[in-house]
Amino acid sequence: MIITIDGPSGTGKSTVAKALAQRLKFNYCNTGAMYRTLAYTHLQEPWNCLSIQELIDNPPFSFSFISEQPLEAFLDGHRLSEELGTQEVANAASRLSQLPEVRSFMHKLQRKYAELGNCVFEGRDMGSKVFPDADVKIFLTASAEVRALRRLKDLPKGSLSQEALHAELVKRDEADSRRIHDPLVIPEGAIVLDSSDLTISQVLEKILALVSPEMP
């Protein structure tokens, strides 16, 4: 069974998808972390001297595909975690995700991960492009103001103002929605959930109610 959760940044996709996978005992894939891994790598020496094509042809990074464990990213043997959460990396990932060769590379890895079996995938084009035949497709949304507040809590204190982060989110939304290759859209057949006034637990329960009838 494949469940996809798409939507813009700050809607709670990652938290909800991870909690959903834990409740269902499914595999969980944070596809945004995959793009951020590539972006982080390209920002570091000596890999910042390579082209993107060279990086994806012979990637120094890797991902763990282990059943019933969240996907983890490694660079040169070092597990990446907090390094992927900076705004600099997020902005770089947004730029790189516009490239068709990058999207094609990531889509192949994501479909490979799906071979593990029951999976929850979260991202921006999971239900529209990578898994159009997913069993359950969710599109999470929220107001830009709420999303900025949520993202602010995840960043180091004083790194960005709420106003600056709000502007970054609006800019990212526009780039994601207007990109030529695999833009951010509501997938056909997806259920749209607005999380602006909902807690993570409330969103999770709503999704579980949608998933339960589809369970084998």
Curated annotation (Swiss-Prot):
InterPro entries attached to this UniProt entry: Cytidylate_kin (IPR003136), Cytidylate_kinase_dom (IPR011994), P-loop_NTPase (IPR027417)
Keywords noted in UniProt: ATP-binding, Cytoplasm, Kinase, Nucleotide-binding, Transferase
Annotated gene: cmk
Annotated family: Belongs to the cytidylate kinase family. Type 1 subfamily.
Reaction(s) this enzyme catalyzes, per UniProt: CMP + ATP = CDP + ADP; dCMP + ATP = dCDP + ADP
HAMAP family reported in the protein's UniProt record: Cytidyl_kinase_type1
Enzyme Commission number(s) of this protein: 2.7.4.25
Listed name of the protein: Cytidylate kinase
Amino-acid positions noted as binding ATP in the UniProt annotation, renumbered to this chain: 7-15
GO molecular function, one term: CMP kinase activity
Localization terms from the record: Cytoplasm
First-level EC class: transferase
Primary location: cytoplasm
GO CC term (a single one): cytoplasm
GO biological process: pyrimidine nucleotide metabolic process
